[in-house]
Amino acid sequence: SDAWQKLRVGIPTASCFDRIITPATGKPSASAVAYRRELLAEWLTGQPVSVKESPWMQRGTEMEAEARRCYEFECDVDVHEAGLIYLDDRKLIGCSPDALVDDDGGLEIKCPAPHTHVSYLIDAKLPTAYIPQVQGAMWVAGRQWWDFMSYHPAMEPLVVRVNRDEPYIAKMATLIEAFVA
């Protein structure tokens, strides 16, 4: 929604933490400078940077509620939508979970193209590209675990439980705190 977009203006969020920290190594990302400039432009104008949604991104947004219901059924849990969560009262760092689960968990849903979903099913693990997002969401939301779900309505879903990686989160926290300083 527009209100949700306004809350995110100028704030690094977990979905873009890979632009600050590299997924596989946990080292600073080469795209951090460009990302900082985008966020500064948002902060100065009060407007989010325009991002062109691909058809698959749009499809993912449209299918998220269906995927969340599937997750609830498959995992026999109740989930709660949360909106934007800030790391602390400074409101400089955030995450937007697809859902919070129980007292200690969260959920990240992806609804990719069929060939990508098949790859995720075969690999049966958190794709490396999403490590910063998932570990970052646990850091920001103060959760102990996060489920990564890949959903395609014509195939079985993939749900992978990911636990906190404290050394990775410590590196991430240092880089992101320096990024917003």
Positions of PLM-derived features:
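Generic structural marker for isolated residues within well-ordered, non-membrane alpha-helices
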Residues: 37, 68, 134
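Charged, glycine-rich intrinsically disordered N-terminal tails and low-complexity linkers that flank
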Residues: 1-62
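Acidic-basic catalytic patches of nuclease active cores, encompassing PD-(D/E)XK
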Residues: 57-79
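Intrinsically disordered, low-complexity boundary segments flanking structured domains
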Residues: 26-27, 66-70, 146-149
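Nucleic-acid nuclease catalytic cores
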Residues: 73-97, 101-180
